[in-house]
A protein has these predicted regions:
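Conserved short beta-strand elements that form part of the metal-binding/catalytic scaffold
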Residues: 37-69, 119-125
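Amphipathic alpha-helical segments
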Residues: 22-36
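N-terminal beta-strand motif that seeds the catalytic metal site of vicinal oxygen chelate
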Residues: 1-24, 54, 69-71, 126-131
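Vicinal oxygen chelate
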Residues: 1-9, 12-21, 46, 64-131, ...
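Short linear motifs in intrinsically disordered
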Residues: 34-39, 72, 98-102
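Alpha-helical segments within the soluble intracellular
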Residues: 31-32, 49, 86
Length: 131
């Protein structure tokens, strides 16, 4: 495999995001009908576990537009992965940044688009040292 075909440390898909029109109804459907494990909810978003891949349900944007599905790829080091992709011509719309402090880790994201304008995010869950 030559250097041009390396995947820059992209891991498994860590999360897929889809738009829903009624969050409570969708939570009930995915949890009660499909049997997915409900993880947590924040304003306008709900998260489920689907065999180790997180499913994010989100309400449409404030302007009423649905967002396209989003692929989130796990990476060990988000800055190194972003730097490697930038060297390949990727222009990041959102630079690596911590977006959530969860119970045991900090969630970092960085986003760009594919040629069809689909959103792709790098995600890194950085453990916090316990005190």
């Amino acid at each position: 495999m030559n250097d041009a075909n390396q995947n820059f440390g992209l891991g498994q898909i860590g999360q897929i995001g889809i738009t829903v029109t009624n969050l409570e109804r969708s939570i009930a459907f995915y949890r009660d009908t499909l049997g997915m494990k409900f993880l947590f909810q924040v304003p306008n978003l709900a998260f489920f576990d689907c065999a180790g891949i997180r499913l994010m349900l989100g309400l449409p944007e404030a302007n009423g537009e649905a967002f396209r599905p989003i692929l989130y790829f796990r990476v060990d080091n988000i800055q190194q992965a972003a730097d490697a992709l930038s060297q390949r011509g990727i222009v990041f719309e959102t630079k690596p940044a911590m977006i959530a402090r969860l119970e045991k880790h900090d969630l970092w994201l960085a986003g760009f688009r594919d040629p069809d304008r689909n959103v792709i995010e790098l995600m890194s869950e950085v453990p916090r040292e316990s005190k």
